[in-house]
Each structure stands twice: as structure tokens, then as C-alpha cells.
């Protein structure tokens, strides 16, 4: 049973990493799953942003022109790591621009502006419940949601819950068709993911992803993947460590990706 050997390989990787690793892969061809600590809670860090943007997209189904709505950004709004919003203090940004900045550059002020518009982090949790995700919980804004304290349930989910939600949002019918296409387009245009899941996959595969990082060396990535000649895959890799100031370990994300996707790169080469 290859599943066992995959789990054994992930366990070996985790021991080597000296951290805690969570993985969930869904093969959408038959909805089969590979998981490792798939039901355990991990701090999401910026991977939480996909659900927040999806909540805005859902609102836009009911309100024509919502994404064009201009949001004022003041100097006092700015929080650490806001490469796009800091350039738009004079003009403000539309909800569409804020969504793109949130997903493609992981701009923290943009995320906070989206949360403010929705009515706070709890509204994102409510949206998650509405798409049948009972695990996801968003409790705080940026940058506080990245504290990733061991055992703290705030701003966490499980790998399998996130994988199922990402599948519903990008490939299922949790969003209307044009909203789903917009989300996928934004994810495919991500600028932060080249050294994470993408680096563990064959070059010609198409990937849309959202990275995340936080305290305790928390290093995350969630992705929808289109292999050559194969139905899409959904992959969530969450990783966290013992020391609060531990270094990020994108190499662990890459290795975990290689382990769980190997069988698909083999089939796509054969065809």
C-alpha cells in the first residue's frame, strides 16, 4: 500500500525537521485523500486570506459593482508588510485591488481592510461555516493572527478542512462561476509561492497558491494544482516548530510536496 509508505516518508521528514507537519492532498479525479496529521489544528497565518477574499467574492454575487467600491486607506491603517497598500494612501483602493493585493502579495493592510469591510474576523468564520467548513476559525486581524502559539486554537484550521474548502472554492460550487474564476485567476497570479509547493512540482504544471508564515517558524502553503494530463489536485502543507524565533522552512514544504505528488508526476510523464 503506497499510502503507508507515503505516510512513513512524511513521518521521516517530520522527524528530520524537528517540527510538526500537517499535510492533506485531495486527488479530484476520485476524491481520494492522502493526509498526515490531517485533522490536527495548525495556525493558518496568511493562508487564512483565501477564505476572507472568498467571503468578499460571495458578497459581490449579491451586490453588483461591489468589487469596484473604493476603500480609503490612511497612514494609521498601515501594518507591517503592506507593499501595495502603502503606495495607495492618496487614492485608496477598490475591493478588487485589495483582494488581489491580499492574495498575490500577502499585503497585511489589504487583508485588514477586507476584514473591516466584512465586519471583522468572525464574519470570515461565518462564511466558512456557510460552505460547510466547521473547523476554520479566524479570530484576529493582521499581524496578530500570526502568533501561532502552540495549542492556541485562535486562527487555526486542520489541513483536511482547508483542503476541502479550497476545493469547494476553486473547483466546486461554493462561489458563482465568475467569482470562482476570479479567485482562481488571483491564486494563479501569486508572487510569493515560487519556493514553496510550486518548487516541489514539475515545471509545466499550473499552480495557484497562497503562502503563510508566522511565529514558531510557521511555514505554510495551500494550492490548487493542475498536473499535465490529470485532474486537479488540492494540496495543503502546514509546518510549525518549537522555538518562537525559529527560521522558516520552505524546504520542508517542498519535500512534503514531492513525497505526496510523486505518483502523479510519474503518471503524467507516461502519457
From Swiss-Prot:
Annotated GO biological process = beta-lactam antibiotic catabolic process; response to antibiotic
Whether Hydrolase counts among this entry's keywords is yes
Entry's InterPro entries?
A: Beta-lactam/transpept-like (IPR012338), Beta-lactam_cat (IPR045155), Beta-lactam_class-A (IPR000871), Beta-lactam_class-A_AS (IPR023650)
Q: What is its EC number?
A: 3.5.2.6
This enzyme catalyses:
a beta-lactam + H2O = a substituted beta-amino acid
Q: Which residues form the active site?
A: 46
User: What does the miscellaneous comment read?
Assistant: The class A beta-lactamase family has a specific amino-acid numbering system, sometimes called Ambler or ABL numbering and often misspelt as Amber. A multiple sequence alignment was used to derive a consensus sequence and then the consensus was numbered taking into account insertions and deletions. This allows use of identical numbers, e.g. for active site residues, despite differences in protein length. UniProt always uses natural numbering of residues, hence there appear to be differences in numbering between this entry and some papers.
The function of this protein is:
Hydrolyzes broad-spectrum beta-lactam antibiotics. Active against cephalosporins.
| Name of the protein in question | Beta-lactamase
Lineage here is:
Bacteria, Pseudomonadati, Pseudomonadota, Gammaproteobacteria, Enterobacterales
Amino acid at each position: 500500500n503506497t499510502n503507508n509508505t507515503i505516510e512513513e516518508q512524511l513521518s521521516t521528514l517530520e522527524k528530520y525537521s524537528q517540527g510538526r507537519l500537517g499535510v492533506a492532498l485531495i486527488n479530484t479525479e476520485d476524491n481520494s485523500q492522502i493526509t498526515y496529521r490531517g485533522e490536527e489544528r495548525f495556525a493558518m497565518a496568511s493562508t487564512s486570506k483565501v477564505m476572507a477574499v472568498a467571503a468578499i467574492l460571495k458578497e459581490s454575487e449579491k451586490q453588483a459593482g461591489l468589487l469596484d467600491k473604493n476603500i480609503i486607506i490612511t497612514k494609521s491603517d498601515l501594518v507591517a508588510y503592506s507593499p501595495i497598500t502603502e503606495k495607495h494612501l492618496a487614492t485608496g483602493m477598490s475591493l478588487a485591488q485589495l483582494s488581489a493585493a491580499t492574495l498575490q502579495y500577502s499585503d497585511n493592510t489589504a487583508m485588514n481592510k477586507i476584514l473591516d469591510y466584512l465586519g471583522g474576523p468572525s464574519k470570515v468564520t461565518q462564511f466558512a461555516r456557510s460552505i460547510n467548513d466547521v473547523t476554520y476559525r479566524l479570530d484576529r486581524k493582521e499581524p496578530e493572527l500570526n502568533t501561532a502559539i502552540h495549542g492556541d486554537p485562535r486562527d487555526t484550521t486542520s489541513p483536511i478542512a482547508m483542503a476541502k474548502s479550497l476545493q469547494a472554492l476553486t473547483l466546486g460550487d461554493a462561489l458563482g462561476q465568475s467569482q470562482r474564476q476570479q479567485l482562481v485567476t488571483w491564486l494563479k497570479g501569486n508572487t510569493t509561492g515560487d519556493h514553496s509547493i510550486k518548487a516541489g512540482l514539475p515545471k509545466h504544471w499550473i499552480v495557484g497558491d497562497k503562502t503563510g508564515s508566522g511565529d514558531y517558524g510557521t511555514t505554510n502553503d495551500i494550492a490548487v494544482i493542475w498536473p499535465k494530463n490529470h485532474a486537479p489536485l488540492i494540496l495543503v502543507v502546514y509546518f510549525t516548530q518549537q522555538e518562537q524565533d525559529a527560521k522558516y522552512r520552505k524546504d520542508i514544504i517542498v519535500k512534503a510536496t514531492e513525497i505526496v505528488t510523486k505518483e502523479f508526476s510519474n503518471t503524467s510523464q507516461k502519457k
